[in-house]
From Swiss-Prot:
Highest classification ranks of the organism: Bacteria, Thermotogati, Thermotogota, Thermotogae, Thermotogales
Function: Catalyzes the conversion of uracil and 5-phospho-alpha-D-ribose 1-diphosphate (PRPP) to UMP and diphosphate.
GO molecular function list: GTP binding; magnesium ion binding; uracil phosphoribosyltransferase activity
Family membership: Belongs to the UPRTase family.
Organism, as annotated: Thermosipho melanesiensis (strain DSM 12029 / CIP 104789 / BI429)
Coiled coil feature spans: none
Pathway: Pyrimidine metabolism; UMP biosynthesis via salvage pathway; UMP from uracil: step 1/1
UniProt protein name: Uracil phosphoribosyltransferase
An individual GO BP term: uracil salvage
Reaction equation(s) it catalyzes: UMP + diphosphate = 5-phospho-alpha-D-ribose 1-diphosphate + uracil
Length: 208
């Protein structure tokens, strides 16, 4: 199973604040951005560097740069938008695409309503952002769409994952690496993660 739980005191602290039901939208947004940045620090280990010569104030030396122009960031709308700024702080030259997917409340199936991507090549490293990996249907659908547009190296970055959703993604997309802040207990009968943090999109945009 290609899942990496980023175990760090700062992430645990900030995630606990996000889980609290009385955390307001302003703080929730800030915490989501901060945790995404911390997870992305680990997830970006897969980016290759190239050697170059630079000049310090004292002498010439060799250094390393990453080619973040080969990086594509794709948040799943709506809630994935709240993660974009966090990873873009680390990779400011990355290209950004968007996928619009919602989960039908009756069937729990993923429905695509929007997709717009920058150029994706064989060398691209694509980060798909989805705060909650619950049933897995939205992430599976998004990964399917991204692959159809040429993505070969894909990393799914999520805040909280369920065992059920993680297993489904691994079955459908065994080549995709998952990074998360927490692997939670289970799903409830409505497809929400327990203990989770509720509906990330609603808390992010104050739509309920």
């Amino acid at each position: 199973m290609k899942i990496n739980v980023v175990d760090h005191p700062l992430i645990k602290h900030k995630l606990t604040l996000m889980r609290k039901k009385d955390t307001g939208p302003k703080e929730f947004r800030e915490l989501l951005k901060e945790i995404t940045l911390l997870i992305a620090y680990e997830a970006t280990r897969h980016i290759e560097t190239f050697e170059t010569e630079i000049e310090t104030p004292l002498e010439k030396t060799k250094g390393h740069f990453i080619n973040d122009k080969d990086v594509v960031i794709i948040p799943i709308l709506r809630a994935g938008l709240g993660m974009s700024d966090g990873i873009l702080q680390l990779l400011p030259n990355a290209s950004v695409g968007h996928i619009g997917i919602y989960r039908d409340p009756k069937t729990l199936e993923a429905v695509e309503y929007y997709a717009k991507f920058p150029k994706i090549t064989d060398n691209s490293i694509v980060f798909v952002l989805d705060p909650m990996l619950a049933t897995g249907v939205s992430s599976i659908k998004a990964l399917e769409i991204v692959k159809k547009n040429g993505a070969k190296n894909i990393i799914l970055v999520t805040l909280i994952a369920s065992p059920e959703g993680t297993e489904k993604v691994n079955i459908e997309h065994p080549d995709v690496i998952i990074y998360t802040a927490s692997l939670d207990k289970k799903l409830n009968s409505k497809g929400y993660i327990l203990p989770g943090l509720g509906d990330a999109g609603d808390r992010l945009f104050r739509t309920k």
